[in-house]
Amino acid sequence: MPKTVPIPFETKALSATPDATAPDGTAVRLLLSLRGGSVAHFELPAGAVSHAVTHRTVEEIWFIVSGRGSIWRRQEGWERQEGLERIESLGPGASLTIPLGTAFQFRAEAGAPLSFVAVTMPPWPGEGEAVPVHGPWRPTVAAGPT
């Protein structure tokens, strides 16, 4: 059996300033990645609404760290079937999935930013991954590169 080169392990603290603006308009603080996925911290300002997007090749799992808000998700191509489009409340301790082909948009309640950590699988490939879609709310933040 051939030996594989091990990937060095890493430790990283959350940066004080964002590294980028996501295509949905959230402030992104990059954390770590491996071949199978990457982790980042996202923050949407209090009272703000993101841009609605879908992803071409990645799936995500989110964990809400702080703040409250709502998320809209719709499985593309299934708009008329019950249960495949919904709006749900978000708060600290909640986790959710964004499967491949899911359109989504979220908003933060007034009073505190909505802050979450997301695992992206496979790692975020870069520009061209996010595709703008029509969502239920009017965005209030500037979008980053798609």
Model-derived regions: residue spans:
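Short hydrophobic/aromatic-rich beta-strand segments that constitute the beta-sheet cores
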Residues: 40-41, 51, 71-73, 116, ...
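A short, N-terminal "cap"/entry segment at the start of jelly-roll beta-barrel domains
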Residues: 1-38, 51-52, 88, 128-146
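Conserved short histidine dyad/triad with adjacent acidic residue
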Residues: 40-58
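Short acidic-glycine-tyrosine-enriched beta hairpin
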Residues: 77-100
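A short hydrophobic beta-strand segment most commonly corresponding to one strand
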Residues: 61, 111-130
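Short beta-strand His + acidic residue motifs that chelate non-heme Fe in jelly-roll/DSBH
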Residues: 51-53, 71-72, 98, 104-111
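Glycine- and acidic-residue-biased ligand/ion/polar-headgroup-sensing regions
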Residues: 57-70, 74-77
